[in-house]
Amino acid sequence: MALPITNGTLFMPFVLTFIGIPGFESVQCWIGIPFCATYVIALIGNSLLLIIIKSEPSLHEPMYIFLATLGATDISLSTSIVPKMLDIFWFHLPEIYFDACLFQMWLIHTFQGIESGVLLAMALDRCVAICYPLRRAIVFTRQLVTYIVVGVTLRPAILVIPCLLLIKCHLKLYRTKLIYHTYCERVALVKLATEDVYINKVYGILGAFIVGGLDFIFITLSYIQIFITVFHLPLKEARLKVFNTCIPHIYVFFQFYLLAFFFIFYSQIWILYPIICTYHLVQSLPTGPTIPQPLYLWVKDQTH
């Protein structure tokens, strides 16, 4: 339990309580249905993708290994969010231990960072395949692919840890134990603190730039290089074919980063917002689209 200090201030709440969607408590049981359906679709779709890639030796190539990594990350990310969300909506179990909240936060931001890194790896692989097709087998060796997967996993996992330590060790006083959210998100938790959160905000923005910002820049540069190469192809049919193979990747890329930038804008700058519209857009960031992104990319790759 939390220890009261003065004027309702709490010293390091032992248990936090999720509010869910403020103002919609009476209909949250219905709101949970589409999230549950999306979660089940993501589990089934990504699991099928992993089984197909694992069982088919011809798919043990860099692009499909990255797709498998993206699929496993999608499963892990949605599993770290949706079950607790449904606990709140359906079973009225909004409480979570403070340390468990930090652990969920670490999982969510780590898996989001992995997704960003995998999208960068896929863009670089596509760039080499289109711009330097004869060098692809030399550049993207199995050893390099292994290093990339390990690197994109460790990068966010390590970068998020100082953020958690800053919350745990630096922020001791909280105005309330109520979180106006359905899962543990860094900004939502930091806003509860009554102490100076400048360091936490700076590190949060810095970490987001190191992971998402740099990935976005390099992905954009990769696709610029791809477009330059495509427009120099002599045959119109060849240009259209190569461009069509890039469309699904560009779609997933823009979907992921536009929602991510909207989330950052909402959490850091936009204070007064239409709650239900903003909430659904923000919630779609971790839970993903109706069709799992890796499965969507795989189907599109097979049709071109």
UniProtKB/Swiss-Prot annotation:
Keyword Mitochondrion: no
Coiled coil: none
Record Pfam families: 7tm_4 (PF13853)
GO cellular component, one term: plasma membrane
Disulfide bonds: 101-184
Glycosylation sites: 7
InterPro entries, A to Z: GPCR_Rhodpsn, GPCR_Rhodpsn_7TM, Olfact_rcpt, OR51/52/56-like
Function: Odorant receptor.
Family recorded in the similarity comment: Belongs to the G-protein coupled receptor 1 family.
Protein known as: Olfactory receptor 52A4
Organism name: Homo sapiens (Human)
Phylogenetic classification of the source organism: Eukaryota, Metazoa, Chordata, Craniata, Vertebrata
